From Swiss-Prot:
Keyword tRNA processing attributed: no
Protein's recorded name: Ferrochelatase
Reactions catalysed according to its record: heme b + 2 H(+) = protoporphyrin IX + Fe(2+)
Organism the protein comes from: Aquifex aeolicus (strain VF5)
Biological process (GO), any one: heme biosynthetic process
Cellular component, GO annotation: cytoplasm
HAMAP family with a match to the protein in the record: Ferrochelatase (MF_00323)
Enzyme class: lyase
Protein keywords: Cytoplasm, Heme biosynthesis, Iron, Lyase, Metal-binding, Porphyrin biosynthesis
InterPro entries reported in the protein's UniProt record: Ferrochelatase, Ferrochelatase_AS, Ferrochelatase_C, Ferrochelatase_N
Binding-site positions, Fe cation: 185, 264
Pfam families: Ferrochelatase (PF00762)
Pathway connected to this protein: Porphyrin-containing compound metabolism; protoheme biosynthesis; protoheme from protoporphyrin-IX: step 1/1
Length: 309
């Protein structure tokens, strides 16, 4: 019997018109923002942020590239796994949704499903939210009969680590000449204090990658803070401002939370932080591409799936 694999990611608007409803879906997720009158507030916040966010996507070509890149990953994984598996894509906050992916598998008579969120490090706000949405989808589709296996993380998988090491080596000829700046998506400190393992797992990922570059100095920083309150520190822009004072001239920026391109990489890192680095006088600002279909990364996904069977 064929098994189903759902590759899950955040999702992104596929047009400028989709920006506001995408933001509404994001801000109405109780696993990220637990607020009173959440849906009403989400509608207001989405409307307030839509114009600025649309501008980001205009600069990126009018849409997020994430769905197409996740499809490429699904195709590459499908080729590795062969005909005993059916690999589909389900997004958390935009089309095709996780429910759409499950529906596609059910139509083929598949009753064993492996969930593979493309978040290397576990957080209740990402992987946890995806799992909760899957359970709601399963109930809505009356699919309680199916067997489900969940892959929670792969932050320390040897092939995932090797993929990043190779990606770095392909980005610059002499990595030892650069200061490595790992930029991870930030989270509210409150979540970490409540036991979310994201920060600890991110630090472990960085440590394992750096075993391949023992002579290189590095910093882990956090980007993309949303709203108020205390978030993980130091922030990426703060680190960029501080390193130049320590006579660092060449930065190699590694988007450690991401396996495909997002607004966080294409706009924040490539535009905002690159411009900041240029203004501050850095000689070089090299941003390592996300893993996408890096062969070692696809091998890591293949291994994760096969070890769950």
């Amino acid at each position: 019997m064929k098994k189903g694999v759902i590759l899950i990611n955040l999702g992104g608007p596929d047009s400028l018109e989709a920006v506001e409803p995408f933001l509404y879906n994001l801000f109405s997720d109780p696993d990220i923002f637990s607020l009173p009158f959440q849906k009403v507030l989400a509608k207001i916040i989405a409307k307030l942020r839509a114009k600025k966010t649309r501008h980001y996507y205009e600069l990126m070509g009018g849409k997020s590239p994430q769905y197409e890149q996740t499809l490429e990953q699904a195709k590459a994984l499908q080729e590795r796994l062969g005909e005993d598996y059916k690999v589909v894509v389900g997004m958390r906050y935009w089309k095709p949704y996780i429910k759409d992916a499950l529906s596609e598998l059910l139509k083929e008579g598949i009753n064993e499903v492996i969930l593979l969120p493309l978040y290397p490090q576990y957080s209740k706000t990402t992987t946890g939210s995806a799992f909760n949405e899957f359970e709601r989808s399963k109930k809505a589709l009356k699919a309680d009969h199916i067997k489900v296996k969940k892959i929670e993380h792969f932050y320390d998988h040897p092939l995932y680590i090797k993929a990043w090491a190779e990606q770095i080596k392909q980005s610059v000829e002499k990595p030892e000449e650069y200061h490595f700046l790992f930029s991870a998506h930030s989270l509210p400190k409150k979540l970490i204090e409540e036991g979310d393992p994201y920060q600890e797992q991110t630090e472990k990922t960085v440590k394992l990658i750096m075993e391949n570059f023992p002579e290189v100095e590095y910093t882990l920083a956090y980007q993309s803070k949303v709203g108020f309150g205390k978030w993980l520190e130091p922030s990426t822009d703060e680190v960029i401002r501080n390193l130049i004072k320590k006579e660092v001239k060449k930065l190699l920026v590694i988007p450690i939370s991401f396996v495909s391109e997002h607004s966080e990489t294409l706009y924040e890192l490539d535009k905002q932080y690159r411009e900041l680095a240029q203004e501050l006088g850095y000689e070089e600002f090299v941003r390592v591409p996300t893993l996408r279909t890096n062969p070692y990364f696809i091998s890591a996904l293949e291994d994760l799936v096969k070890n769950e069977v």
